[in-house]
Amino acid sequence: MSRIGNKVIVIPAGVTVEVNGATVTVKGPKGELVRSFNENITLEIAENEITVKRPNDTKEMKMLHGTTRALLANMVEGVSNGFSKALEMIGVGYRAQLQGTKLVLSVGKSHQDEVEAPENIKFVVATPTSIVVEGISKEAVGQTAAYIRSRRSPEPYKGKGIRYVGEYVRRKEGKTGK
């Protein structure tokens, strides 16, 4: 059984947390995040720590307790340090380039795929085959990286496509001729 909800969240220096009913605003050096949580879950802020409390021990409240704590911890981490997800492109002629805030992908199609950067998300293209998605919201960074990967996910025969750095792509053997 998970006890993540019982862990205390430490607020680092330079980060402020405001609770207004069920809405929580977290401000830090990298930006500001606002999110609404279930009104049954209560947040207690004392000095530089946040404690998440649940009203009872029903299954639903236990689930919400852990989820709320994890989301809140990610908000605090995001506004203080930020999040990033690195992707690599493998394949002949597979390229990425920035045009303003837009990411332009050449991934073996008859046209180029353009990915517009969502709010609070930044793309970094160090080399034509590497992409880094940066932002303060862990959810938005992961979702954007997954969308970029979906433009050409790695195929199992040659391993070509866009993959996360360090991702293992399971390979298949090709057909055997007579």
Swiss-Prot record:
Q: How does it assemble?
A: Part of the 50S ribosomal subunit.
List the source organism. Answer: Lactococcus lactis subsp. cremoris (strain SK11)
Is Nucleotide-binding included in the keywords of this UniProt record? no
What would be one Gene Ontology cellular-component term for the protein? cytosolic large ribosomal subunit
Q: Known NCBIfam families for this protein? A: L6_bact
Q: Membrane-crossing residues?
A: none
* Keywords associated with the record: Ribonucleoprotein, Ribosomal protein, RNA-binding, rRNA-binding
One Gene Ontology biological process:
cytoplasmic translation
Instruction: Give the protein's recorded name.
Output: Large ribosomal subunit protein uL6
Gene transcribed to yield this protein:
rplF
What does this protein's UniProt record list under function? Answer: This protein binds to the 23S rRNA, and is important in its secondary structure. It is located near the subunit interface in the base of the L7/L12 stalk, and near the tRNA binding site of the peptidyltransferase center.
Q: Which family does it belong to?
A: Belongs to the universal ribosomal protein uL6 family.
Q: Annotated Gene Ontology MF terms? A: rRNA binding; structural constituent of ribosome
Q: Does the keyword Nuclease apply?
A: no
